[in-house]
């Protein structure tokens, strides 16, 4: 017969081994590289499977929360130390009643999803406020711990697309019309909201003389209509543009080249 102290030691060892094994399993299920990817305020939460997961053997659960660094004095007052960022009447704005919200909320469309991403654009539309997202995985009846994103503030972190260009030839010159990217919000009259409503933007226009293989910046400013003059007849030119955000010292990628022949 096994002595009592040996049997007790066996039970303790068995229990600790089981706990360690369970913790190891949970850790290996935990989603990796959980982060927001944002373009033009389309805010997508993305992640990678845990080390133990392959294929479609698991499902994921997504939560999010907004973190305001202020507190409400009363339900009728603006939070102390806070300020209203934007005065507008389209769905991208939130009322002051939203200030102070800190609870994790389920994203119903991504609750039990097999995808590795979740669109949180609508849930993160207070663009100057910080957010967090988190994801947990489940497989074969086991659940991982939550894996959380770094702090995400859309206004600071979204990347904007290059401008859309329309080019028209006018008496040997080129008239370039630039359009800033639209956002996923709309005004009440169904008018698209532009990135210009949120940032000071400068447009940069470059022209390339194909015969000389030489690029020249011909414009930098806030106007969206740019005329390029003094072009050489019977020559080929290409035009590209980008957007620069002075406050963030950040620029977009360049647009696709648009090429024309000057008669």
Curated annotation (Swiss-Prot):
Q: List the disulfide bonds.
A: 110-118, 238-259
> This protein's superkingdom?
Eukaryota
Site described as Critical for IL22-binding, located at 99, 151
Instruction: Extract one GO BP annotation from the record.
Output: cytokine-mediated signaling pathway
Presence of the UniProt keyword Cell cycle in the record: no
A single Gene Ontology CC annotation of this entry is: plasma membrane
**Main localization of the protein?**
secreted
List the glycosylation sites: 56, 166, 171, 192, 209
Q: Name one GO molecular function term.
A: interleukin-22 binding
Signal peptide range in chain numbering: 1-21
Per UniProt, the keywords (alphabetical) are:
Disulfide bond, Glycoprotein, Receptor, Repeat, Secreted, Signal
Q: Which Pfam families match?
A: Interfer-bind, Tissue_fac
Q: Where in the cell is it found?
A: Secreted
**Distribution of this protein across tissues and organs:** Expressed in placenta, spleen, breast, skin and lung. Also detected in intestinal tract, testis, brain, heart and thymus. No expression found in prostate, bladder, kidney, ovary, muscle, bone marrow, liver and uterus. Isoform 1 is expressed only in placenta. Isoform 2 is expressed in placenta and breast and at lower level in spleen, skin, thymus and stomach.
The keyword Signal appears for this protein: yes
| InterPro entries documented for this protein | FN3_dom, FN3_sf, Ig-like_fold, Interferon/interleukin_rcp_dom, Type-II_Cytokine-TF_Rcpt
Domain Fibronectin type-III: residue ranges: 26-68, 100-161, 162-263
Function, as annotated: Isoform 2 is a receptor for IL22. Binds to IL22, prevents interaction with the functional IL-22R complex and blocks the activity of IL22 (in vitro). May play an important role as an IL22 antagonist in the regulation of inflammatory responses.
- Family named by the database record: Belongs to the type II cytokine receptor family.
Stated name of the protein: Interleukin-22 receptor subunit alpha-2
